[in-house]
């Protein structure tokens, strides 16, 4: 056994290092924040909001691929899929909302066009976090 050849303080150090390595490995393999998914109704911003500041401070730009979500941190990249069409788009959360009961996300006009949401205005969607931004959810 290797402990016969090492001083007691050295054995304790190696055990501490091994325990730390195991803890880091378990933390890295644990559940990821990017596993967040949500299903519900999605809609898109009205044209009247163009140029107005979002909750993050950036102005709303209809031509960008952005979204509003009530709890995901700003900067989080999510995939929004229109359940009816099967089409999806990647967007960045930069606003809070939607402020309508029963809705889980508002997307920009460009994002809405990509997933076939413009005509319907509201449709069932599925969200999946691609890359979580640092911060609270």
Identify the meaning behind each predicted range.
Residues 2-18, 22-137:
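Secreted/periplasmic proteins
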């Amino acid at each position: 056994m290797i402990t016969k050849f090492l001083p007691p303080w050295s054995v304790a150090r190696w055990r501490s290092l091994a325990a730390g390595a195991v803890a880091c490995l378990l933390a890295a393999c644990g559940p990821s924040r990017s596993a967040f998914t949500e299903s519900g109704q999605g809609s898109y911003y009205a044209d009247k909001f163009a140029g107005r500041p979002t909750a993050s401070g950036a102005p709303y730009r209809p031509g960008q691929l952005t979204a509003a979500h009530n709890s995901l941190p700003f900067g989080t990249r999510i995939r929004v899929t229109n359940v009816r069409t099967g089409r999806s788009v990647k967007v960045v959360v930069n606003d809070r909302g939607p402020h309508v009961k029963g809705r889980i996300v508002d997307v920009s006009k460009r994002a809405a066009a990509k997933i076939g949401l413009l005509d319907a205005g509201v449709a069932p969607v599925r969200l999946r976090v691609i890359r979580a931004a640092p911060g609270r959810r």
